[in-house]
């Protein structure tokens, strides 16, 4: 599996991202396609004795900051790690894209660049939530402020497919949580 990783996203990037990427290569045997300021990433790896084995780097010159307006940033920062990473995913250069950067920009970028499956109007953020009996998948963790019924149905289908294929659960149950 090849995972495209935003090396510039998150509070302690690129160091924290590099540490995680190197650990993923070592423990899971995945390939990493790291997107970011290549010179800074290489220098950070060297300064901290982090091996770049299994990590291929793609240089880009811009970063979408947390304070940037998401849609404007996606449209104007074409050489940002998020935009470049999402384009690489769209081109089939990796199996997944991971970023600890701007959630809003990632959400907008996924819709505009990668696009959604037929019948899915909006992407949904998802997270595995630990529980006593069995972890569960929580979809649309507050990313969409207003959801129509057909969007909720699409989220249910996406979540069910994910839990079935990734977690190996044959007949996952679906529930609606609301405040």
Where do the protein language model's features map onto the residues?
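Acidic/glycine-enriched edge-of-secondary-structure segments
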Residues: 5-6, 113-116, 145-151
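Ligand-binding beta-strand-loop-alpha-helix segment within the catalytic cores
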Residues: 134-178
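Short, charged/polar low-complexity linear motifs in solvent-exposed/disordered segments
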Residues: 32-33, 125, 154-156
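Short, acidic/small-residue loops that bind anionic groups at enzyme active sites
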Residues: 107-142
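Contiguous, glycine/small-aliphatic-enriched amphipathic segments in soluble metabolic enzymes
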Residues: 1-112, 161-177
């Amino acid at each position: 599996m090849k995972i495209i990783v935003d090396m510039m996203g998150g509070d302690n990037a690129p160091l924290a991202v590099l540490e995680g990427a190197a650990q993923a290569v070592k423990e899971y045997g995945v390939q990493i396609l790291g997107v970011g300021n290549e010179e800074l990433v290489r220098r950070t790896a060297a300064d901290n004795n982090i091996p770049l084995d299994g990590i291929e780097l793609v240089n880009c010159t811009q970063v979408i900051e947390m304070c940037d307006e998401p849609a404007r940033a996606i449209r104007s920062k074409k050489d940002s790690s998020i935009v470049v990473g999402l384009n690489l995913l769209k081109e089939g250069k990796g199996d997944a894209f991971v970023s600890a950067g701007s959630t809003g920009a990632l959400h907008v970028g996924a819709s505009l660049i990668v696009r959604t499956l037929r019948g899915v109007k909006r992407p949904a953020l998802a997270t595995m939530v630990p529980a006593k009996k069995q972890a569960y998948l929580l979809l649309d963790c507050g990313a969409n402020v207003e959801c129509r019924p057909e969007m909720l149905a699409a989220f249910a289908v996406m979540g069910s497919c994910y839990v079935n294929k990734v977690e190996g659960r044959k007949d996952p149950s679906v529930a609606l949580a609301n405040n």
